Structure formats: C-alpha cells, structure tokens
Regions:
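Active-site microenvironment of metallo-dependent hydrolases
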Residues: 1-39, 44, 102-104, 292-308, ...
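Divalent-metal coordination cores built from histidine and acidic residues
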Residues: 2-4, 9, 95-206, 533-535
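Solvent-exposed alpha-helices and their adjacent loops that cap or buttress functional pockets
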Residues: 14-16, 34-35, 61-63, 132-133, ...
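Histidine/acidic residue-rich metal-binding segments in metalloenzymes
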Residues: 124, 157-179, 186-253, 260-281, ...
Length: 606
C-alpha cells in the first residue's frame, strides 16, 4: 500500500472525510470473530474503511456518507471466493462467466485456464486474461502447470518452465500463481522440469502453487507437500482430506457439476469444526444450468449447512479460508487486493442476504463497493470487447483439426477380459473392470484433434486401407465403457480433459461416426439413428460458447432431455460424464489416443 493510499484510507476510517457508502442496520457476519453481530460498514473507493458494532462502538458515532443503504436487519457477509475452477468448463467466456458468477455471490474466482491452454497454449491464456479484464468481479488467473497434463499427452500445446518465466516477464502481475500440479510422478521423482515449473511460481504475486493429488498418501504426500504445494481439491473421503490437512495443506471441498464431494467430506468438519479454518470451497467445473438454478459457492454453503456445518463456519470457508490459502487476507498491500472478511482495509466485496440458508440467490451483491447483482439478476457492467480480445477470439475459432475417418474405424469387436472403464456417477474417478462379455458395454473412442493425425495421413499413414485405420493406437484410441447407458445413438464432444481431443461414446459405429462429423469446430452433440438431435456449439477453442450463460443453459437443458430419452439416466450427467473419461491424471482407467490407460500404474491396459 502506498503512503498516499494509506493516508486516504486512514482519513476515511477516522471519519475525517465522507465515505461513499454506509451500510446500516446490518447483521454482520464476522468471520474473524465467528459470530453474527449488528452494526454498520463504511466503504470508500471500493474499500471497507470502517466497521462499527452496535453497543460496543456507539461512542464512536457514525460515518458521514454519500449514500446510506439500510440493510433492514439483513445479513451482511463477505463476498465468496471460488478456490479452484476452470471457467472454460462453464462453456462461456470469462466476461460472461463473471456476469453469471456475480449473481450467485462469487466476487473472486481463482481460475486455472489449463483447458484453453491445452488447445491454444499461452495465446489461449492471454485471451482469458484480456477478456477477464472486462469483468465486474475479480478473476485471479493461475498459470497452467501441466500443459499437457502428462508429458506424452497429445494436446495442442506445451508450456515449459521457460515459457512460464518468459510470460511472467512479459506480462508482470497478470498471472496470480501456479495452477494445479497434476504431474504426480514428476513431483515424486523430483523431475527437473517439474521442479522448475513449481519454482516459477516465485515470479507471481501470490507465489502459491495449487494442487491436485487424488488418493496420494504416505511418503508421496510428504513429498508433494514438501514441494510447497498449498492446497488440494481432489479428496473424496474424510481420511484422505485429513491426511492432507495434517501435512499443512488446505483442503478444498469440491461441489461442482460432475463432482459432489462436500457431503462425503463433511464428517471431518463435524467431528472437529476447528478444521474448517484450513478448508475452503471449490466448484472446479460448473455448468451454467446448475449455476443459474442452484448456485455456485453459495450452493456449497447450502450443502454444508444442510449436513450440519454452522452457517458462519460455512461462510468463513467460502471467504476467509480461501483468502488465507492464497495470501489475500493480510499484509500492507493495496487494499483492493485484500479480501475474505468484513474488516477495515479489505476490498468491499459484500453480500446482503435475506437469511443464512442459501436457498436462493443473494439479495444483493457488491464487488469493490459497486452493486453488481440483485435477487439473482445481474445489474452491473461488463466492459465492451476490445480489438485485442476480438482478434484472440477469432484465432480460437479454428481449433478442431480432425483426420479423415471411415466407418471401419468405429466398428471393432469386444475381446473377453479386456480392460473396461467403469463409470462412477457423480465422481471424477472411474473404475476398471474386465468382463467376459459385452453386455451393458458401449464403445468409446478418443480422436486426436490438434492436427497430428492430419499430418500423419498426409504422409500416407493409412496406406491403401480405409481412412483412419492407420491412426488407431497412435492418434485414435478405442475401447469400451460400462455404466454409460446411451442407446440407439452416440454422444460426442470436443471437450475431453485435459488435452481436449474428440471423445465419442455410442452403441453403434454409424452414429458414432456421424457424431464425430457433427462436432464441426466445437461442441457437444447427440446423434440418434443418423439424425443430429441436440447440439451445444462451442466455437471458442472447442470449449466455450460465444453466447450468454442463459443461452448455454437452455441448450444444456434441451441436450439433457434428449440424452435422457436415449437412455442416459441419472445420476450420470451425460456431458460431465463423457468429458472426464479421457482425463489421465485421476484414477483409475482412462482412454487416450493410444488406447486404454491405467492411471494407477501409468501403463496401458490390454
């Protein structure tokens, strides 16, 4: 904090100059004192400069203010911080994501844009950063640490430690920290490149490294924590979460669209509520249809409260704990950077709440003192798109480069005893089975879409055979999945974590081929009996729509109805279900362009 800013804040805090806004008659959610107490809050230039509690501070008088907002006994809570998310997984661009998130009380997002980086490299990250500048909320971008997710993944880009360092030097302050470190073997083996990437975080404002450590324990967990990785959002059982807490890590309880881990982890908190100080919330991946209807971090608060967590504790986890994890809660810094609590010297991210159940959207949401949402409706401003953002967006609209494919590629037989993916609805993890027959199974394929297959075909990879067969096992993976009950057709998507090759699941070769052809330059598609019955277009990198959150939500709802009619029954989410099947960093069995991959052994499974 500069001396000039400090003097301005102090003068306002002492009441020597009028404040901009005074919130009165509020029930203040005090996350430091772990209480709710009546009082008033003064804001100047987007910063909280004064908090006065009724009774205790009556002698201090009040503040002269340009605007007085009577909260009429409503609760006043700190704005929510999403500790880990991928904006691209909401299928909307950052400025649109911010508009949506603001309506549900998220005023800060810690965003890892490794989705677009896996498609378009650092140019993709630049698009996210520049588009995010238009947002009325604060988006803190983390440098993707694992592009690709594994060294031999067939992604659209590679970001090395040297690339990171050059980007930090060229764009100082634009990246907040290092995103989730998914290369577990690289950490455990002290791989020089992996260590250099972790060390690169020292060039960022936060100097923090986010984590990704599903089922990691013992000496491996010791090594992971010793590397300086501060947090993890992959725990699915209380014992796993407690292991990480005990090693000094923050645990993010994930409540998204695909993964719902919060309730499973809650016994750890209920057994000892003091643990909540080192726990926070993350959505990771949240579809607009879910975000708009049931919420984001506010939904995590609701779920936590429903399973028995005290509301003030839940709000603290949604704000202060996350701020502490990333070093955003203290220090003699620009007060616009400090957040996570209603306290002097913090950014004025504030929620006015009718109650503490989170059954509905916040009554009002303020970001840096400005009203941005009321009763679930966005009322703030999103800045116009700049020429730079428009140019970067145009470059992202030609990202799908698929090889020529014949029907023969999609028509293959099941081999008794071969490794099959077992879908686990509501979880990012999968199982592995070795059935003796194909009953209940569906074909699954992953087709590289970043141009490698196209280049190999140009060199004659297929010989005189049908188009694409020469790429099988190299750039086209084929296998089987159980629990993905699509019937009479196929589903395909250009989203396939994290390299985002084209994934297709179906019960017949013809519809699978038609679905792959239908994805075009990006999107989710459903094909039934040769007919395209539903589509969500995602032109930006094959990941994001150019439309609004409401547009995508409506398309998603239609897609879900059509998918249910094709036999994909709850609790399996057809979109979230398919897009995580290629993810090679979460156990157990995954599909890659080379074939079926056992994450637990890092070997290909026959």
């Amino acid at each position: 904090m500069s001396a000039e800013v400090m003097r301005s804040v102090i003068d306002a805090a002492e009441g020597r100059v009028p404040v901009d806004t005074l919130f009165t008659n509020a029930q203040i959610v005090d996350v430091y004192g772990q209480r709710v107490a009546p009082g008033s809050v003064a804001v100047k230039d987007g910063v909280i400069v004064g908090v006065l509690y009724d009774g205790r501070d009556d002698a201090a008088g009040t503040y002269e203010a340009t605007e007085v907002i009577d909260c009429q006994g409503r609760y006043l809570a700190p704005g929510f911080i999403d500790g880990h998310l991928h904006i691209e997984s909401s299928n909307i661009r950052p400025a649109e994501y911010a508009r949506m998130a603001a309506t549900r009380g998220t005023t800060t997002a810690i965003a890892d844009s490794h989705e677009i980086a896996n498609v378009a490299g650092l140019d993709g990250l630049r698009f996210m950063i520049e588009d995010g500048r238009r947002a009325p909320i604060s988006i803190k971008y983390m440098m993707p640490s694992c592009v690709p997710a594994l060294p031999d993944e067939q992604a659209g880009a590679v970001i090395s430690a040297a690339d990171m360092q050059a980007f930090f030097a060229e764009h100082p302050g634009d990246v907040f920290g290092l995103g989730e470190m998914m290369n577990l073997p690289g950490v455990f083996m002290a791989d020089p490149e992996t260590c250099a990437r972790i060390d690169a975080a020292n060039q960022t404002p936060s100097k923090q490294v986010d984590g990704h450590a599903p089922l990691v324990a013992g000496k491996d967990l010791n090594a992971y924590a010793a590397a300086g990785i501060i947090a993890d959002h992959e725990s699915t059982i209380p014992e796993e979460a407690l292991d990480k807490l005990s090693r000094g890590m923050y645990v993010m309880l994930r409540e998204g669209t695909c993964s719902h881990d919060l309730a499973n982890l809650s016994p750890m908190l209920l057994e000892n509520p003091a643990r909540a100080r080192r726990c926070c919330f993350a959505t990771d991946d949240r579809a607009p249809s879910d975000a708009l209807s049931t919420g984001m971090i506010d939904n995590a608060c609701r779920v936590a409260i429903e399973v028995g967590v005290d509301p003030v504790v839940a709000i603290s986890m949604a704000s202060l704990s996350t701020a502490e994890a990333f070093g955003l809660d203290h220090g003699c810094r620009d007060p616009h950077e400090l957040r996570g609590a209603i306290a002097p010297g913090k950014r004025a991210d504030l929620l006015v709440l009718n109650d503490l159940t989170f059954a509905t959207a916040p009554y009002r949401v303020y970001a840096a003192g400005a009203l941005v949402a009321q009763d679930g409706t966005f009322v703030g401003e999103v800045a116009p798109e700049t020429a730079e953002v428009a140019a970067l967006a145009d470059e992202l609209c030609a990202s799908v480069k698929l090889p020529k494919l014949s029907l023969d590629v999609f028509d293959y037989a099941f081999k008794p005893g071969e490794a099959v993916i077992d879908v686990v609805p509501g979880k990012a993890i999968t199982g592995m089975a070795r059935p003796e027959n194909a009953e209940g199974l569906r074909r699954i394929m992953l087709i590289e879409r970043h141009g490698r297959g196209v280049s190999l075909q140009a060199e004659g990879a297929d010989g005189d055979g049908p188009a694409g067969l020469g790429l099988v096992g190299k750039h086209i993976g084929r296998g089987w999945v159980r629990g993905f009950t699509i019937t009479g057709g196929a589903i395909a998507s250009t989203i396939g974590h994290d390299s985002h090759n084209v994934c297709v699941v179906g019960d017949n070769a013809a519809d699978m081929m038609a679905a792959v052809e239908a994805v075009g330059q990006g999107g989710h598609v459903l094909v039934r009996n040769g007919e395209l019955v539903a589509r969500i277009p995602l032109a930006l990198g094959g990941l994001m729509s150019e439309g609004t959150a409401e547009d995508v939500a409506a398309q998603h709802d239609d897609f879900m109805v059509k998918a249910r009619a094709m036999g994909i029954e709850p609790p399996l989410d057809p979109i979230m279900g398919i897009i995580f099947l290629p993810l090679p960093v979460i156990p157990t069995l995954r599909i890659r362009p080379e074939g079926m991959f056992d994450v637990t052994t890092f070997t290909y499974a026959d």
